Amino acid sequence: MKPLGRLRLGVNIDHVATVRNARGTSYPDPLRAGLLAEAAGADGITAHLREDRRHIRDEDITALMQGLRVPLNLEMATTPEMQAIALRHKPHAVCLVPERREERTTEGGIDVAGDIGRLKDFVAPLRAAGCRVSMFIGHDVRQIEASAEIGAAVVELHTGHYCDLVAEGRTAEAARELEALREGAALAHSLGLEVHAGHGISYDTVAEIAAFPQVMELNIGHFLIGEAIFRGLGSAIEGMRRRMDAAREAAA
């Protein structure tokens, strides 16, 4: 199967806000980072408004909605408060993620299969408001099928475990995880879902994931913000964009 089209890059700017909040200052500004990302080739900006506001804050979402030219993808937990915020702002996309206060980052996918009734009701008003709803899930068949059942338009496959295995040099396990992700992407596409992928992606892991023909968007943040310390945000994003495009071209 040939790639379905140009692979989009969503840049997550959460950790610009992490640096800002570490000192309680007004800088660095997440919106400024978003605008730099736009100029460097990002197709969209992702921001996770966590319940504890540990990085992105409510006022950041307002500023991003007003200042960005590319679409905003709002990551959030499935709580009434977050639903109300999304319905007020009506971002282009809403990605629903699991959330625990004690975690350092999103550790796994959302359990759609175990909460179909509630999530179907949660998703419906977001869809009615014009938001493209995405479920951040693992490659488990049940979760993919349940995401289609509740009316999500998109699934974002959690690539964190694969990226960790690559970083740890566990080659055989990484190959098995990559194949499971590939099969998950194919299943999701066959069910009419648009397929995205994200979490933990770096220069070392992007090519294999970008080569999945069904994947239409990668969301990448922490690595790019870290790389920006050494080479600048624009250069870091351009480097990722080049690797994505090369992998896509090779898969065509």
Curated annotation (Swiss-Prot):
It is an enzyme of class 2 (transferase). 1-deoxy-D-xylulose 5-phosphate binds at residues 14-15, 50, 55, 105. Gene3D superfamilies: Aldolase class I. The record marks 156 as: Transition state stabilizer. It catalyses: 3-amino-2-oxopropyl phosphate + 1-deoxy-D-xylulose 5-phosphate = pyridoxine 5'-phosphate + phosphate + 2 H2O + H(+). GO terms for molecular function: pyridoxine 5'-phosphate synthase activity. Pathway: Cofactor biosynthesis; pyridoxine 5'-phosphate biosynthesis; pyridoxine 5'-phosphate from D-erythrose 4-phosphate: step 5/5. It comes from the Bacteria. Keywords: Cytoplasm, Pyridoxine biosynthesis, Transferase. GO terms for biological process: pyridoxine biosynthetic process. One of its GO terms (cellular component) is cytosol. Pfam families: PdxJ. 3-amino-2-oxopropyl phosphate binds at residues 12, 23, 200, 221-222. Its EC number is 2.6.99.2. Homooctamer; tetramer of dimers. Catalyzes the complicated ring closure reaction between the two acyclic compounds 1-deoxy-D-xylulose-5-phosphate (DXP) and 3-amino-2-oxopropyl phosphate (1-amino-acetone-3-phosphate or AAP) to form pyridoxine 5'-phosphate (PNP) and inorganic phosphate. Belongs to the PNP synthase family. This is Pyridoxine 5'-phosphate synthase. It comes from Cereibacter sphaeroides (strain ATCC 17023 / DSM 158 / JCM 6121 / CCUG 31486 / LMG 2827 / NBRC 12203 / NCIMB 8253 / ATH 2.4.1.) (Rhodobacter sphaeroides).
